[in-house]
């Protein structure tokens, strides 16, 4: 019997909506990253994007444990000398709560073109309203 390999054109992708309210950031991000990769499916193939679409709502209500809300720092660099910027978790969650979840999930995906394709299937929104109702996403409990 030959080993099964999923073909990109035959992969069936579902849409799921995840409510981030009260969820721990890391535990939420690991489950989302696993679903984006397709590791929950029996036809998972490492070199093929077999994952589903994930819509995350209530991103501003995600929580972190311990003193991370004040101690966790996000760094970015412009590429120019002295161009490093930093922002704390508290300030980032107030300014752009979507970026907190996006950054956590992106760090858990492969760092290659396939990982970038997987990342594009993640949709994160600030409130409880999202524009993907036409796709009829199923609720995913994490």
Swiss-Prot record:
<dbReference type="Pfam" id="PF00572">
    <property type="entry name" value="Ribosomal_L13"/>
</dbReference>
<dbReference type="GO" id="GO:0017148">
    <property type="term" value="P:negative regulation of translation"/>
</dbReference>
<keyword id="KW-0687">Ribonucleoprotein</keyword>
<dbReference type="InterPro" id="IPR036899">
    <property type="entry name" value="Ribosomal_uL13_sf"/>
</dbReference>
<dbReference type="GO" id="GO:0003729">
    <property type="term" value="F:mRNA binding"/>
</dbReference>
<dbReference type="GO" id="GO:0022625">
    <property type="term" value="C:cytosolic large ribosomal subunit"/>
</dbReference>
<dbReference type="GO" id="GO:0003735">
    <property type="term" value="F:structural constituent of ribosome"/>
</dbReference>
<keyword id="KW-0689">Ribosomal protein</keyword>
<comment type="similarity">
    <text>Belongs to the universal ribosomal protein uL13 family.</text>
</comment>
<dbReference type="InterPro" id="IPR023563">
    <property type="entry name" value="Ribosomal_uL13_CS"/>
</dbReference>
<comment type="subunit">
    <text>Part of the 50S ribosomal subunit.</text>
</comment>
<dbReference type="GO" id="GO:0006412">
    <property type="term" value="P:translation"/>
</dbReference>
<comment type="function">
    <text>This protein is one of the early assembly proteins of the 50S ribosomal subunit, although it is not seen to bind rRNA by itself. It is important during the early stages of 50S assembly.</text>
</comment>
<dbReference type="InterPro" id="IPR005823">
    <property type="entry name" value="Ribosomal_uL13_bac-type"/>
</dbReference>
<protein>
    <recommendedName>
        <fullName>Large ribosomal subunit protein uL13</fullName>
    </recommendedName>
</protein>
<dbReference type="InterPro" id="IPR005822">
    <property type="entry name" value="Ribosomal_uL13"/>
</dbReference>
């Amino acid at each position: 019997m030959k080993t099964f390999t999923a073909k990109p054109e035959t992969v069936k992708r579902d849409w799921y909506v995840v409510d981030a309210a009260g969820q721990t950031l890391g535990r939420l991000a690991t489950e989302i990253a696993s679903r984006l990769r397709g590791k929950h499916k029996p036809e998972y193939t490492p070199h093929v994007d077999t994952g589903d679409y994930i819509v995350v709502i209530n991103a501003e209500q995600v929580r972190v444990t311990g003193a991370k809300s004040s101690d966790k720092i996000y760094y970015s660099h412009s590429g120019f000398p002295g161009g490093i910027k930093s922002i704390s978790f508290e300030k980032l969650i107030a300014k752009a709560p979507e970026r907190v979840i996006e950054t956590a999930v992106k760090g858990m995906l492969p760092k290659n073109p396939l990982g970038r394709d997987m990342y594009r299937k993640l949709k994160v929104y600030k409130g409880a309203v999202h524009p993907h109702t036409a796709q009829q996403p199923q609720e995913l409990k994490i």
